[in-house]
């Protein structure tokens, strides 16, 4: 069995209006493409920027939270829309998906928690997802003003999956800050996305902490970034040592170095990304097929460990039948 632990379903108004890519993914299209490649199950969550922000600003690529957005509570609309798609609109495809709810740790915390409790009473979801870079929300707040979300995760015994960065241009989602939060709450499980941008110090901290994992979402374009020494990748002096011209080799090396903490995820459809990095437009292009091929180039034991067993340990499902072959 191959579980893909990192996928977005829905639409992103800022990406569409600002001319960035990708801006949407349909649940049925994701499962059909993935299943043809050998993927069996998917962890899924909404797209990144909720419709609570000023629409005119989104078109300029700006985040302004002034009460004029289409909704008032971050991700309330997006989370409910995802649950309806999985459980009501497309239950045949939805039965192979484990939905996570998204949240903003910095804005309207009490209102979000109220909405999450209400949603939990109507639908099952299995974790909480944060992407704080695009919404310019400091991940540090999760351990302070936003600790109510951590208390929810502890109460429901569900994990976090958190977008991580290491570049100076991104103060909102620093991997070291996420690890500080995880260290503060040792009884809650955390996954840091994107292999901590190959920052060895952060990967070693993930390995040392009992409650942290990392995923390799958008692996191929991150390998490309390492080869080109792009600023969204850890500097060479801090970088995990591997042959980044060979994404399959990097997976093998990470799996050997961090045998129980490394999880595979594609980041569909964000295995490709076109957008701005500072003053430059990035065009990073990969495919779902390339992500799966880099995984499958490894030994069957490695594939089963990072795309099945480690993910199950992080999810810690009360009902393992959810991951049974249908």
Regions found by a protein language model. Give the residues of each.
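An N-terminally biased module of ancient metal coordination in phosphate/nucleic-acid-related enzymes
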Residues: 1-77
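Hydrophobic faces of well-ordered beta-strands that scaffold small-molecule active sites
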Residues: 3-7, 42-44, 98-101, 126-130, ...
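Conserved, mostly hydrophobic/aromatic
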Residues: 6, 34, 82, 128, ...
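Active-site environment of divalent metal-dependent phosphoester hydrolases
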Residues: 10-12, 49-52, 106-108, 134-136, ...
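A structural motif corresponding to the C-terminal end of an alpha-helix
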Residues: 33-40, 82-98, 152-157, 185-187, ...
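Active-site gating/metal-coordination segments in enzymes
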Residues: 60-169, 173, 221, 236-239
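Glycine-enriched alpha-helix->loop->beta-strand junction motifs that scaffold or abut catalytic
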Residues: 122-127, 148, 155-159, 184-189, ...
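H/E-rich (His + Asp/Glu) clusters that bind or coordinate divalent metals
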Residues: 196-326
